[in-house]
Amino acid sequence: MQVVKIPNETIKFKYGTVDKHAVVFQDTIVYTGSEPQCNRFVHYMDGSSAEEILERAK
């Protein structure tokens, strides 16, 4: 899994605006959010099967 920045897209939170990121697994975006949210997703899904990870993309 790889966390990549989505160019020209941001997310607005109550404390400010941050860049939007995505988690890419086997050429599929499985999660989008802020960089810390994406890193947390990668951490929690570490060790999961490919089917479980790709199920999150639906």
Task: Spell out what each predicted region is.
Residues V4, I29-V30:
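Local beta-strand/beta-hairpin segments that build beta-sheet-rich folds
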Residues M1-A22, D46, A50-R56:
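Short N-terminal "domain-start" leader segments
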